[in-house]
Design a protein with these regions (language model features):
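Non-catalytic, soluble scaffold/interaction modules
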Residues: 1-179
Length: 179
């Protein structure tokens, strides 16, 4: 038996099976095409990511639907799209451009005073991670729990949490903060 001690987000004790959620790395090493082709790939990936979010929103519980709508709106943000396009124009691949722009935008939002807005940084990273998955041809991971478990991850994103069967989640352990 292994004991894990951490800073609790709420009172209580959880004992159970541990399930690890490891987000796969993006395919930043793939060949970069022309800026025009990379921009087209980015636009197509955004549309596909938005379609995925619409499908998730339709299946989600009423209290969770806003998460998917917010992420769809974030993917339409003109500033984010221009930031991605600027990296593509100078020769970066679409996936690398999305990841870089997402990091910059998330950093700006984390610096805001409004706590609600700071929370949106995670939504930007989550939505952009979905776009990168589409660009890389990887399915977006969803964790399917088969029994009660403690979920361990470096970081949990909003869509990770709302797509889980919460009746099976005994607790969360993250190294990057609370979900």
């Amino acid at each position: 038996m292994k004991y894990i001690t951490a800073v609790p987000a709420s009172a209580g004790l959880a004992v159970g099976t541990v399930r690890y959620l490891r987000h796969t790395q993006s395919g930043l090493g793939r060949a970069v095409r022309s800026p025009k082709e990379e921009q087209e790939a980015f636009e197509n990936a955004v549309r596909e990511a938005q379609d995925q979010l619409i499908r998730l929103e339709r299946r989600a519980a009423a209290q969770d639907r806003d998460i998917f709508m917010v992420q769809r709106v974030l993917l339409e943000d003109e500033g984010l799209r221009q930031e991605v396009a600027s990296y593509i124009r100078v020769g970066a691949g679409a996936a690398a451009s999305v990841e870089r722009a997402a990091g910059i935008f998330a950093g700006r939002i984390r610096a805001l005073e409004d706590p609600y807005m700071r929370e949106r940084a995670c939504d930007i990273l989550d939505a952009c991670r979905r776009v990168v998955k589409v660009l890389d041809g990887q399915p977006h991971e969803t964790l399917r729990l088969t029994g009660p478990a403690i979920l361990v991850a470096e970081e949990l994103y909003p869509t990770d949490i709302v797509t889980l069967d919460r009746s099976l989640v005994l607790g969360f352990i993250t190294s990057a903060g609370s979900p």
